[in-house]
């Protein structure tokens, strides 16, 4: 593993050898869970994760996948920066979750962030299959079939309901 990944996650080559799962086995197990679809995949910066998932599941049979990108939601809720670590702080979750870049910690952190977002405003469903992207840089990677991509600039804080990305899309 590259040193930056070891530094970020604490996962070493030795640990991968003793505790890791072979990619083909992981792909088969994940595909089995998703075969009947639809499956809602949730990620912070889902476009990034979707590229990895697409590669992992290449050749596997899966049902429809819907996407909820918490980064798109968060950009309508808070000012820059927009990392998951920033959302953990913004929603006062630092004593409850960790941002360790380890799968289980990140899943638990994202779950708590989404609960806080839903408590703040019950509109998460309107963000399903809607990804905002920075108009300065465009969409990174291949676009996901079924996802609508819209330019989304930075906000200065909690956006009024009528100014959120989903509300602007509906008005068009």
Per-region residue spans from a language model:
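Conserved beta-strand -> loop -> alpha-helix junction used to position metal-binding or nucleic-acid-contacting
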Residues: 62-74
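Catalytic phosphate/metal-binding cores of nucleic-acid and nucleotide-processing enzymes, i.e., regions
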Residues: 75, 80-82, 144-146
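Short secondary-structure transition/capping segments
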Residues: 26-28, 108-112
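Conserved non-catalytic scaffold segment of RNase H-like nuclease domains
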Residues: 1-64, 79, 84-101
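Acidic donor-binding loop at a coil-to-helix junction in glycosyltransferase catalytic cores
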Residues: 104-105
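Hydrophobic side chains within alpha-helical segments
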Residues: 52, 72, 108-109
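Acidic two-metal-ion nuclease catalytic site recognized across multiple nuclease folds
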Residues: 111-172
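Generic alpha-helical structural context detector
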Residues: 72-75, 86-89, 112-115
């Amino acid at each position: 593993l590259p040193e930056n990944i070891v530094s970020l996650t604490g996962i070493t080559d030795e640990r991968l050898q003793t505790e890791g799962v072979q990619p083909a086995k992981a792909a088969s197990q994940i595909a089995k869970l998703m075969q009947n679809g639809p499956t809602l995949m949730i990620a912070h910066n889902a476009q990034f994760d979707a590229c990895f998932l697409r590669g992992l599941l290449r050749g596997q049979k899966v049902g429809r996948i819907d996407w909820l990108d918490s980064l798109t939601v968060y950009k309508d809720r808070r000012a820059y920066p927009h990392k998951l670590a920033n959302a953990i702080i913004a929603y006062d979750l630092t004593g409850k979750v960790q941002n360790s870049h380890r799968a289980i910690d990140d899943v638990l952190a994202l779950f708590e962030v989404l609960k806080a977002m839903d408590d703040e405003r019950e509109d998460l469903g309107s963000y399903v299959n809607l990804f905002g992207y920075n108009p300065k840089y465009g969409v990174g990677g291949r676009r996901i079939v079924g996802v609508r991509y819209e330019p989304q600039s930075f906000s200065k804080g909690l956006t009024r309901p009528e100014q959120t990305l989903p509300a602007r899309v509906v008005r068009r």
